Regions:
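Short, solvent-exposed loop/turn segments enriched in Ser/Thr/Gly
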Residues: 347-348, 560-568, 580, 629-631
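Terminal connector regions
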Residues: 625-655
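Extracellular adhesion/glycan-binding regions together with long Ser/Thr-
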Residues: 606-627
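Mobile, glycine-rich extracellular loop/lid and propeptide segments
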Residues: 21-358, 363-389, 401-431, 454-461, ...
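Asparagine-centered strand-capping/turn motif at beta-strand->loop junctions
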Residues: 570-577, 589-591
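Low-complexity, acidic Ser/Thr/Pro/Gly-rich terminal tails and inter-domain linkers that flank the onset
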Residues: 539-563
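Short aromatic-acidic-glycine turn motif
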Residues: 587-608
């Protein structure tokens, strides 16, 4: 590995293909915490109607039901490296926009010749057309710059019949092109005699009967899809289907209603047990177990080991083996049959894998949480979920039940020992963990109520500080409303986009199940046919102090692995005045083959923009005359040499 300095420039190695500032999946991570704890720009002090608001709108060709995803420093074909937001629509389109300026880079339609998006299948839940509904997932390790995985529904109208398609697509982030082997038709079968069986002992996946409402999950090189019905229109069952990211070969299949039997008047044909979660995706823990909530449907007679003999799991909190997709544990409310009959299914919500917690006795517990229409928050011990209690009329077999009282159509968020839930026609509530137990009543709540379907909050912070809870409201006025609250106290609303006069921050009609994406100083919130991009308005730029500093580097040959290297980088104040922090070393003009590993952000205001920087602020907050501040910076490069120009910015202004 060779290094050379160019006039005020260094030749270093650059970064990881996956950066801390990416949002590559639903609710930020496979645990589905909804937390971005690397947000350095947006803090409670500057998120208000004077400093924060709508920057621009990204117009698209259909409804946006999927969460926008953010990819930093991605190599766009013919353009170079840019921060990009990916938007998918129900018109079967995928867009890549510049996340900082709104410039469109590419747009692809996933419709084959003579095809159109699916009709709504006689169901108004996703309407007027069905295309891409579930949030995609992005993997950067699969190539340079990476790959987007998503499911698209379409139809071909023939003279006598209409053929429906569900296809898994893998698209290059560089230009939206299909990667080798993409797309593949979604097909599956499962042993059973339940709804949709072929009369020969197998239930068949019929693409016309399903929609991919749940977000996709990526785990251990497998992309998992999970399937829901159209308005409970029979026949349908509960499918999870997994595909290998490289070959797109189907490698996992699970059906949790393979032998569905009528269990109530509400389910006359026994259909049910689907996965929809109001757009939430399956979650996964650090041990590789998957978690999900099923909707209304039959729950089978138990065998001696406590599992349903027929494999039917209605209204159930499932734990699945990633190796086989077998159900290895579960929790089902004792009154499951009544819940199914009353359409108060557990499957309207999503699961969240919580960090390890200590109880009052010092025991470390491994928890997950989920809630649905019945108004209860269920906390399960992932090691002993509790199965179902048929002996007594209670849920004493589960770790903890907290009565929320609000129906949940969405997912919670977790931050700093707190859980945030937003139910239907209810306030957004904060609950707090203590000694491994959740508070039985809210510790704070918003002053405004959210109508249908409630809200799925997201949180931004810098570590455990500067927490902001973001919540999307599908307002009764028909307009979309973005709210921001202090994560310390939800009664403190920092901002909502109706506060500014003259509709300055209006960004479109509201939509249900929308999750805001917060990354790198921006908030992306979908409306019916666009995505609003919010950020700081009147910005004070940081000062360029490069002329008053000296930047040195020293390679550490002992700390090298393949193309990775550790470099000691020093910034010395050679001027006559103290330099007040924050102080940032910016890596300008990086060649396209290079990355900076784990930067603290990228420039959005001080030109040139889009350059990554590393924080060099001393502990005292300022760099005194002749003082030197040193960091070990890791780099990676696809070439032998990497060139950049160092730039040093100082002060509290925006980079």
């Amino acid at each position: 590995m060779k290094f050379k300095w160019l006039a005020l420039a260094a030749v270093l190695l650059a970064a990881s293909p996956v950066l801390a500032t990416d949002v590559l999946t639903f609710h930020n991570n496979p645990a589905r915490t909804g937390l971005n704890d690397h947000e350095t720009t947006l803090v409670p002090a500057n998120v208000n109607q004077d400093n924060f608001g709508l920057l621009f709108n990204l117009s698209v060709d259909g409804k946006v039901d999927a969460q926008p995803l953010y990819i930093s420093s991605v190599a766009i074909h013919g353009v170079g490296r840019r921060n990009v937001v990916v938007v998918a629509t129900e018109h079967d389109s995928v867009y890549a926009f510049d996340a900082d300026s709104g410039t469109p880079y590419w747009h692809v339609s996933l419709l084959s010749n003579q095809e159109v998006p699916s009709d709504n299948r006689g169901c108004g839940q996703v309407s007027p057309e069905i295309g891409i509904t579930g949030t995609p997932v992005i993997i950067r390790e699969s190539g340079n710059p990476g790959t987007i995985y998503l499911v698209a529904m379409s139809k071909a109208n023939g003279k006598k019949t209409t053929v429906y398609h569900q296809r898994l697509h893998a698209l290059s982030l560089a230009d939206g092109s299909e990667v080798a082997g993409s797309p593949v038709e979604v097909e599956a079968s499962s042993p059973g005699k339940g709804p949709g069986n072929n009369g020969s002992g197998h239930v068949i996946f019929n693409p016309a009967d399903y929609k991919e409402r749940a977000a996709l999950l990526l785990h251990n090189n497998i992309v998992y899809t999970a399937w829901a019905s159209h308005c409970d229109i029979a026949p349908y069952t509960g499918w999870i289907i997994g595909y290998h990211v490289n070959s797109l070969a189907r490698v996992r299949v699970l059906n949790v209603d393979p032998n569905g039997r009528p269990s109530s008047r509400f389910l006359p044909d026994g259909s049910g047990n689907s996965f929809w979660g109001s757009g939430a995706g399956l979650s996964v823990d650090n041990n590789g177990y998957l978690y999900g909530l099923t909707a209304n449907g039959p729950f089978g007679e138990l065998s001696s080991n406590g599992f349903p003999k027929d494999g039917d799991y209605g209204d159930t909190f499932l734990k699945l083996s990633a190796q086989t997709l077998d159900v290895v544990d579960y929790f089902t409310p004792y009154n499951q049959a009544q819940d199914a009959a009353a359409d108060t299914d557990l499957g309207s919500g999503g699961t969240l894998v919580l960090p390890n917690m200590a109880t009052a006795s010092g025991e470390i517990v491994h928890l997950a949480v989920g809630a649905g229409k019945d108004g209860n928050i269920y906390l399960v011990n992932r090691n002993r979920m509790g199965k179902i209690n048929l002996k007594t009329s209670d849920n004493s077999n589960v770790y903890q039940v907290v009565v929320l009282g609000d129906s949940i159509f969405g997912s919670p968020a977790y931050f700093n020992g707190c859980l945030f839930y937003g139910g239907v026609n209810a306030t957004l509530k904060q609950f707090t963990f203590h000694d491994g137990l959740l508070s039985t009543s809210p510790t704070s709540a918003t002053t405004v109520s959210f109508g249908y379907p409630g809200t799925t909050p997201s949180v931004s912070s810098f570590g455990s500080d500067s927490g902001i809870v973001w919540a999307y409201e599908n307002a009764s006025s028909g307009n979309a409303v973005l709210h921001a609250y202090s994560a310390l106290d939800l009664t403190q609303e920092l901002y909502n986009n109706t506060q500014a006069p003259n509709n300055r921050d209006a960004f479109g009609a509201g939509n249900k199940f929308i999750v805001p994406t917060i990354c790198n100083g921006k908030v992306f919130a979908a409306s019916t046919n666009s995505v609003g991009v919010f950020g700081l308005l009147a910005v004070k730029a940081a000062q360029n102090v490069t002329q008053w500093v000296k930047v040195d580097r020293e390679e550490d040959p002992a700390d090298r692995e393949d193309d990775d290297i550790a470099v000691k980088v020093s910034v010395t104040n050679t001027g006559t005045q103290t330099i007040t922090g924050p102080i940032s070393l910016v890596f300008d003009d990086l060649n396209p083959e290079s990355y900076v590993l784990a930067p603290d952000g990228s420039t959005t205001t001080v030109a040139p923009t889009g350059s990554f920087y590393v924080d060099f602020t001393p502990a005292s907050g300022e760099l005194m005359k002749e003082q030197t501040e040193t960091r070990i910076v890791r780099f990676r490069s696809g070439t032998e040499t990497v060139q950049f120009h160092p730039r040093v910015l100082a002060g509290a202004g925006i980079r």
